[in-house]
Amino acid sequence: MLVAAVDLPTPFQTVKLPDIPKQGTARYKAVAHVVLHTTGGYPDSKHPTPQRIRPEAAAPRHCLATDVHAYWSRTDRIGAAHILIDADGAVYQIADLSTRAMYHCVGYNQVSIGVEVVQQSDSSLFAAQLVSVVALCSWLADTFKLPRSVAMPYTGVRDVVDGVGVLGHRDLSSNRGSGDPGDFVMEALVDAGWAAV
């Protein structure tokens, strides 16, 4: 469905960071997918610090959403997403969901909402972030009438994505390897009852 201006509801929108000034134009196609990313990702399974999940609560020093927002706001950066999930699980909207993000996934910007999970320098994520991924994706699926299906297991870049509600950047771009966002993020949705397709 095409949408007018959409903002995340409470409790997700704990803080709305300013919209990134370079955000794209209004959508001319319906939202068909959520594309999940991690800020670091990793290029392949040989990465020296593969992703891991930290069970403890994130300390303030781990919360980097405002740093990511500032980086994406620079005029020399083309990347961006609609939503950030910080280390403590806080969800930040940084672009109107009714617009296409300027650039988060080649070929899918017009038909998807980009969600970036903030990763630590050692590639780790916090368990609270996975809880927020599930809650946010569930809300997005309800709001945009998306199927509760997730691209799992990872099989490389997919030629066909019809009927898949949530994809990883890794499923759509050959230069992302298996780690953007990585199995932990995708498995959280399957564990919450989403269909693996």
Label every PLM stretch briefly.
Residues 1-109, 177:
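N-terminal catalytic cores of peptidoglycan-degrading enzymes
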Residues 1-15, 24-29, 121-197:
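Basic/polar, cationic surfaces and motifs that engage anionic cell-wall
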Residues 33, 112, 165-167:
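Structural preference for beta-strand elements that scaffold enzyme active sites
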Residues 100, 114-125:
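Substrate-binding clefts and substrate-entry loops adjacent to catalytic sites
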